């Protein structure tokens, strides 16, 4: 059994979605197909919600644009009139729900995280119905029923055990071709719609592959695989044939956007290979990610970078030789759900610099200033110094 994930560009045009159909129908094995929203729709859903929140009536035109795009897609790819009629009925119902939510946001000028999560869920809900109707013999399964999250530090995180059991139960008697919306989930306790974050469709596919001990996880995208560098910057970059899980994770963490980083862990534990393939060039070998690369003659696999980096420096003469300062830094940040992806310490031990995302910078500075408030007051340490708008190259 295989799990195939198709991203937004792979379902974003008539050409790409028909290529998806050919790829899936050409599989002899059982396959579970995880799909993202049509390319650009998630961003459009978010932008439209902000217009509605601000009382801007142009949100209605944006909503109608999304409707039209989905209707045009259905009209272009579904020939069977009976199937088309049934699909359009489902899409009409979903858009009526979404229209009501937007109108509510417009009226009361409130957009809570719960409502925002519900709004962005419609992208995958719509695309999965389209793909399930397009692929002959396919059955749609609703990931809201089996991908479960819990709240930690104010953020929704996967409840791995509950989800794994629910996935096994859901697909116990699966059909040969199954279609699943990626990205979306529900809170284990409240049942409210949540999601796995941007790139979460990759994660959905990995979770399912691991729970069902799949033969392989295939990530279908718009590139031939991992490249030795960003081809937009380095024109001589070429596709990497094989990577280890660790190498792929490093490249992903440092800006290679081919695979969402959390995707790797669930399948790595089960030793399930990941293949990154190109929907527009399905005959290309792509990149295979596995536990160990044999006969590896190239110690440096690739170069990647992260834009939007903030470097925060924790400094003070009192830090020299003092045990536990770094523990306090990382504990304080972790308790507030802030991730650190780079650390550098001066040889004299009087300063430690950490890399965080620009979007987390303001909160990180506040957290650390609070953690070391006593030391800052006495002059033993300096207030936190942050430099934003940087890039990390690795």
What are the language-model segments listed below?
Residues 1-259, 264:
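Nucleotide/pyrophosphate-binding catalytic subdomain
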Residues 2, 138, 178, 194, ...:
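A broad, low-specificity signal marking well-ordered, structured residues that form hydrophobic/aromatic
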Residues 6, 36, 141, 180-182, ...:
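Generic beta-strand/beta-sheet core signal
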Residues 29, 272, 338:
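Short phosphate-binding/catalytic loops that engage adenosine nucleotides
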Residues 35-42, 46-53, 64, 227, ...:
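Terminal amphipathic helices with adjacent charged low-complexity linkers/tails
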Residues 164-170, 261, 276, 298-301, ...:
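Intrinsically disordered, low-complexity boundary segments flanking structured domains
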Residues 284-394:
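A conserved regulatory-domain signal marking ACT and ACT-like small-molecule sensing domains
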């Amino acid at each position: 059994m295989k799990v195939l994930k198709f991203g937004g560009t792979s379902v974003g045009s008539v050409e790409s979605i028909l290529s998806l159909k050919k790829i899936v129908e050409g599989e002899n094995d059982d396959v579970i197909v995880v799909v993202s929203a049509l390319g650009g729709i998630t961003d459009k859903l978010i932008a439209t919600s902000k217009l509605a929140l601000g009382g801007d009536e142009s949100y209605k035109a944006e909503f109608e644009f999304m409707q039209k795009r989905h209707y045009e897609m259905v009209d272009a790819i579904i020939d069977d009139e009976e199937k088309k009629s049934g699909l359009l009925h489902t899409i009409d119902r979903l858009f009526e729900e979404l229209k009501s939510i937007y109108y509510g946001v417009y009226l009361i000028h409130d957009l809570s995280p719960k409502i925002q999560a519900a709004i962005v869920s419609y992208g995958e809900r719509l695309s999965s119905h389209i793909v399930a109707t397009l692929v002959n013999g396919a059955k749609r399964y609703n990931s809201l029923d089996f991908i479960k999250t819990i709240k930690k530090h104010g953020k929704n995180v996967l409840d791995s055990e509950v989800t794994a059991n629910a996935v096994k139960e859901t697909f116990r008697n699966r059909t040969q071709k199954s279609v699943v919306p990626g990205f979306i989930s529900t809170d284990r306790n409240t049942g409210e719609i949540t999601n796995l974050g941007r790139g979460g469709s990759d994660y959905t596919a990995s979770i399912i592959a691991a729970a069902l001990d799949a033969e392989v996880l295939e990530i279908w995208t718009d590139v031939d695989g991992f490249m030795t560098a960003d081809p937009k910057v380095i024109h001589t970059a070429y596709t990497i044939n094989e990577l280890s899980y660790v190498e792929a994770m490093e490249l992903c963490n440092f800006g290679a956007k081919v695979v969402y980083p959390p995707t790797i862990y669930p399948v790595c534990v089960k030793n399930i290979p990941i293949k990154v393939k190109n929907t527009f060039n399905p005959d290309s070998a792509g990149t295979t990610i596995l536990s160990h690369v044999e006969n590896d003659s190239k110690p440096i696999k690739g170069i990647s970078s992260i834009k939007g980096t903030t470097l925060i420096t924790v400094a003070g003469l009192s830090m020299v030789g003092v045990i536990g300062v770094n523990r306090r830094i990382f504990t304080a940040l972790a308790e507030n759900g802030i991730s650190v992806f780079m650390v550098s310490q001066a040889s004299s031990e009087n300063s430690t610099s950490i890399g965080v995302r620009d979007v987390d910078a303001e909160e990180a500075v506040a957290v650390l200033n609070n953690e070391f408030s006593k030391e800052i007051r006495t002059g033993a340490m300096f207030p936190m110094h942050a430099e934003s708008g940087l890039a990390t190259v690795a």
